[in-house]
């Protein structure tokens, strides 16, 4: 039995570090490169497991070297991989990441690969019942995400949706969500309210509650968080500054 089921994608992050990010038509010499686990769902599963949670990870991989890398990495973090589908027709997802080592800025191209072909018929839906919490994002096909959210809610789980990458959602989505965790840009996408400060974030959170979501957590980077439920709003100051944020490159290096 797992504490939490994560539905999401794995992509092999291929990161190139150098003094700059190449522009169109330019070839540059980099300093180093690294290959490691990526994808929001994969990163969330690893983070939860390292915090002591038991994780069931649902995804789809290609039957290739990167797929084997994924299984190996997940198993090393004690994540249940028994509900990952392996495809002989599709490749494992990859992301090419150019990183400017001086500024930390990056440019990323993601090819989702196998997860983009995931269907409801392939998922062992009943494995979700063995968890207390269901967590997902918007990297898996929308119809699959909605199917799993609905099943999880009907099975009594707490549903958490990290709405990234932001995309248009039907009203059906919101009634199955207990916790909605957008960042500033994603909150603006769903509410139309541009967030320049905490007051804007509070207004955005209030509007999301009015759309039918039970609890909203808007992440504001180093500015902290805004947490909103029907009768209460909480302004969390500077919480992020006191926490070590482990970025993708550090996760890759374990």
Residue ranges and their predicted role:
Residues 153-233, 240-246:
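Conserved phosphate/ATP/ADP-binding segment of small-molecule kinases
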Residues 1-60, 65-79, 243-251:
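Glycine-rich phosphate/adenosyl-contacting loop at the front of the ribokinase-like
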Residues 46, 94-98, 107, 224-228:
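Short beta-strand scaffold segments in enzyme catalytic cores
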Residues 78, 113-120, 159-166:
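Short gly/ser/thr-rich secondary-structure transition/capping motifs
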Residues 86-87, 97-133, 138:
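Conserved phosphate-binding/catalytic loop of the ribokinase/pfkB sugar-kinase fold
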Residues 32, 58-63, 81-92, 162-164, ...:
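Beta-strand->loop->alpha-helix junctions that form or flank phosphate-binding loops
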